[in-house]
Amino acid sequence: MIETPTVTLEEDGIIFVDFRSLLVTLDLLYDGLNQQRALAPKKKSKVLLVGQAATKVDTDMIEFGACAETVQLTAAVAIVPLSKIGWILANLFMPLQRNPYPTRAFDTIEEGREWLLSLDAG
């Protein structure tokens, strides 16, 4: 069985994507997006991504956030890296990302959630 991120629609309306110990890949991002679509079809959601680190930060990973499928379903993204390497990769990713919605990295899940809830609905 292939492991996938756990994706839940929280009571506050945030889509919580938990990669746990999985290394984030483009395929896993698309899996999470498909689960998001199933939970909140045709709705732009605020997304809280939590994980250890990505396998790499390449053009495909950077462009994922700006692709039509992702933009159609996403109002904002808070990223919470759970490891030092995750923070390094997030710092590399943030200046390169071309997301047409707010995207920020946070130290804690609580900080990411507070920021998402402070934004106007998308």
Spans of model-derived segments:
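Amphipathic, Lys/Arg-enriched alpha-helical "gate/interface" segment within cytosolic domains
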Residues: 1-122
